[in-house]
Amino acid sequence: MRVLLAALALFSLSACQAAPHDFPASAKAEFNRGCPSSDSVCECTWDELTRAMTYEDYQAAVDRFRREGLMDPRITRARTHCIERKHA
């Protein structure tokens, strides 16, 4: 019985997501220029990004992508998660 309760508690905690970090409206507007809010994958990706990264981390990742063409793995994971969820 204890094992079952422990497993249930762990499962419940794993389902919890962190609250979104604060991002300025201009960051979302910039994101939506390339990924429209009318697309459910884009909206999901934005939600995942704001939970996984601070605005400062996100901006650094965008700057790095523009400068070096390298995508931050957290952005890739967020988008992949949303694409897979849409087609699941």
Where are the predicted features?
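Intrinsically disordered, glycine/charged-rich N-terminal periplasmic/extracytoplasmic linker segments
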Residues: 32, 43, 47-88
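Bacterial signal peptide processing site
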Residues: 17-19
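C-terminal motif of bacterial Sec signal peptides marking the signal peptidase cleavage site
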Residues: 12-15
